[in-house]
Swiss-Prot record:
This is Large ribosomal subunit protein uL15. The keyword RNA-binding applies. Keywords: Ribonucleoprotein, Ribosomal protein, RNA-binding, rRNA-binding. Residues 21-31 have a biased composition (Gly residues). The lineage of its organism: Bacteria, Pseudomonadati, Pseudomonadota, Betaproteobacteria, Burkholderiales. GO terms for cellular component: cytosolic large ribosomal subunit. Belongs to the universal ribosomal protein uL15 family.
Length: 143
């Protein structure tokens, strides 16, 4: 096989349909657009969501919620995660290294989920009231 002999498989290529070129083509006169009306005219069609003047669905339904753009910079860590962590002093870079929070995380908060039995010192990390109590009960602190 040579590069100059390669051609597409039969049936893979189709000739462009030429509309409005006589009765014999099957798409003559109105070119498959029917008679009159907005859809038959050049450049004539409605915008997306237009319902003929009726109030469109996206305007009939109530506005609801939003997606926070700061969410990708926030992260949560559980007490169980801190239990398996080797470090005694925990800060955001330590958690990133351990793979417990994403690389883009800026704000980290510890939530009370699981048990904590070892002493842990949090630096620059927030904690819920329950998590703070559990950390202090284990001999740690939240700075």
């Amino acid at each position: 096989m040579e590069l100059n002999t390669i051609k597409p498989a039969s049936g893979a290529k189709h000739a462009k349909r030429r509309v409005g070129r006589g009765i014999g083509s099957g798409l003559g006169k109105t070119a498959g657009r029917g008679h009159k009306g907005q859809k038959s005219r050049a450049g004539g069609y409605h915008k997306v969501g237009f319902e003929g003047g009726q109030m469109p669905l996206q305007r009939r339904l109530p506005k609801r919620g939003f997606k926070s753009l700061t969410l990708k910079y926030n992260a949560e860590v559980t007490l169980a995660d801190l239990q398996v962590l080797a470090a005694d002093e925990v800060d955001v870079p330590t958690l990133k290294q351990a793979g417990l929070v994403g690389e883009r995380a800026k704000v980290v908060k510890v939530i009370k989920s699981g048990e904590l039995s070892k002493k842990v010192v949090l630096k620059g990390i927030g904690a819920t009231a329950g998590a703070k109590a559990a950390i202090e009960a284990a001999g740690g602190s939240v700075a």
